[in-house]
């Protein structure tokens, strides 16, 4: 399940998050729009810092899995109203997070665990996009 997989993410949030963001920026350049003037190169301090923030937010959501909406409410407001992030970018990032987990945790990412993580990321995406309506 997602909690079991995420136990192996803990302590590696910066590495996994930076890799997922780097892949998103490289494969889907439109995601770079919100980071004008930032160094988005593979080893940049910004990329590693922001990647860690993203993965730590997901770690927090898992810790509050019964109330993802409540725990991600402020992030949802920020992304919708302040940053005005295109909601489609959450799908893109979720895809790259799954890719990174498959790279680093291939033995753990069975079909059932893949489905569990994918469902969790979909729930998070739904919460983050709920303020757009």
From Swiss-Prot:
SUPFAM superfamilies, A to Z: Globin-like (SSF46458)
Bilayer-spanning residue ranges: none
Source domain of life: Eukaryota
Pfam families recorded: Globin (PF00042)
Keywords: Heme, Iron, Metal-binding, Oxygen transport, Transport
PROSITE patterns xref list: GLOBIN
Biological process according to GO: hydrogen peroxide catabolic process
Binding site for heme b: 79
Keyword Transport: yes
Domain Globin: 1-133
Tissue specificity field: Red blood cells.
Gene3D superfamilies: Globins
Cellular component terms per the entry's GO annotation: blood microparticle; haptoglobin-hemoglobin complex; hemoglobin complex
Molecular function terms, GO-annotated: haptoglobin binding; heme binding; metal ion binding; organic acid binding; oxygen binding; oxygen carrier activity; peroxidase activity
Record has Metal-binding as a keyword: yes
Binding site for O2: 50
InterPro entries recorded: Globin, Globin-like_sf, Globin/Proto, Hemoglobin_a-typ, Hemoglobin_oxygen_transport
Function comment: Involved in oxygen transport from the lung to the various peripheral tissues.
Complexes and interactors: Minor hemoglobin is a heterotetramer of two alpha-2 chains and two beta-2 chains.
Sequence similarity: Belongs to the globin family.
Name under which the protein is recorded: Hemoglobin subunit alpha-2
Native organism: Pleurodeles waltl
